Amino acid sequence: MTPSTLPIDQYDAQLAEKTGRLKAMMASYHAPEPQVFRSPVSHYRMRAEFRIWHDGDDLYHIMFDQQTKHRIRVDQFPVASELINRLMPALLNALRPHLTLRRKLFQIDYLSTMSNEIVVSLLYHKTLDDEWRQQAIALRDQLRQQGFNLQLIGRATKTKICLDHDYVDECLPVAGKQMVYRQVENSFTQPNAAMNIQMLEWALSVTEGSKGDLLELYCGNGNFSLALARNFERVLATEIAKPSVQAAQYNITANQIGNVQIIRMAAEEFTQAMRGVRQFNRLEGIDLASYRCDTIFVDPPRSGLDEETVRLVQEYPRILYISCNPETLCANLATLTQTHRVSQLALFDQFPYTHHMECGVLLEKRT
């Protein structure tokens, strides 16, 4: 695979290999057959980052070969959304005549949506001044006249210039409802929107008919919390990143959801609060004891759950666990399956043509 070509004819084979690998990893935990969710074979990634190479008055996107470290010119990138591919040449054509915008530009980041909004971040090794801002405004307006619903941001060391705002609003059809998600530049969002929809719908299906409340750790912008709210009486969710918390609060309002409460704190801190080890001012006005959470949802970073959080989640009758790293999931399952059994397993091909897998498990307490 190169940046400009995809081995689409090998898609089924690579998915079968991942399925077999996941089944082998999960065999010792007596997991059921996985449900397998396919990705679109191209234009599936909603964000992309490119370094910029300057050649005299010309410039172009590049990536680096992971083995040889050689640079590769990238004019089209079929991994990324069609919107990103349309904007890539249009943006460079608009940049070339403007030395102020070109000079010391070393990276361009794109974040697109299925709702055809896109935010572009231009990263520089220089100070950004008023002249840069004026030319950036002209660049933004020129691209908008070409039909791009675009937000433009300039970044340099300790500097962020946002011409309008630094987010896009995604709209996803999830199990018969349109869900609005504000996605903030430089914050985590699910990269494969089509797979995100399938993950949300799978999570809804395996929690259908739930009783009581839901606790979510690592909620981000509320991606899962808000979709799952329809299956629970109340949802209590934690997130540490301030921009993600702000986006989640907006998303609660935009989706007119009244049963979700977001708390800004780390999962480790929340564990301490639940155990009564520490008191936090951030929890003032929130009666943790009033929640009857029979289900806990976790979508941790690649490192998985720390030991203390594993012990916390074991206290809940049902654990819904989304993992972007099955190896750390299995490490956690070695402990979790002492008290719970794996009742559902899913493979989401979030990262086609790569070694990486995303999977989901539902664990239910042994009787």
UniProtKB/Swiss-Prot annotation:
GO molecular function terms listed in the Swiss-Prot or TrEMBL record: rRNA binding; tRNA (uracil(54)-C5)-methyltransferase activity, S-adenosyl methionine-dependent; tRNA binding
PROSITE patterns given in the database record: SAM_MT_RNA_M5U, TRMA_1, TRMA_2
Matches recorded under Pfam families: tRNA_U5-meth_tr
Keyword field contains Methyltransferase: yes
Keywords, in A-Z order: Methyltransferase, S-adenosyl-L-methionine, Transferase, tRNA processing
GO biological-process terms attached to the record: tRNA methylation
Disulfide bonds: none
Chemical reaction(s) catalysed: uridine(54) in tRNA + S-adenosyl-L-methionine = 5-methyluridine(54) in tRNA + S-adenosyl-L-homocysteine + H(+); uridine(341) in tmRNA + S-adenosyl-L-methionine = 5-methyluridine(341) in tmRNA + S-adenosyl-L-homocysteine + H(+)
GO cellular component, one term: cytosol
Enzyme class, first EC level, given as a word: transferase
Catalytic activity, EC: 2.1.1.-, 2.1.1.35
Active site: 324, 358
Record: residues binding S-adenosyl-L-methionine: 190, 218, 223, 239, 299
Described function: Dual-specificity methyltransferase that catalyzes the formation of 5-methyluridine at position 54 (m5U54) in all tRNAs, and that of position 341 (m5U341) in tmRNA (transfer-mRNA).
Annotated family: Belongs to the class I-like SAM-binding methyltransferase superfamily. RNA M5U methyltransferase family. TrmA subfamily.
Record's protein name: tRNA/tmRNA (uracil-C(5))-methyltransferase
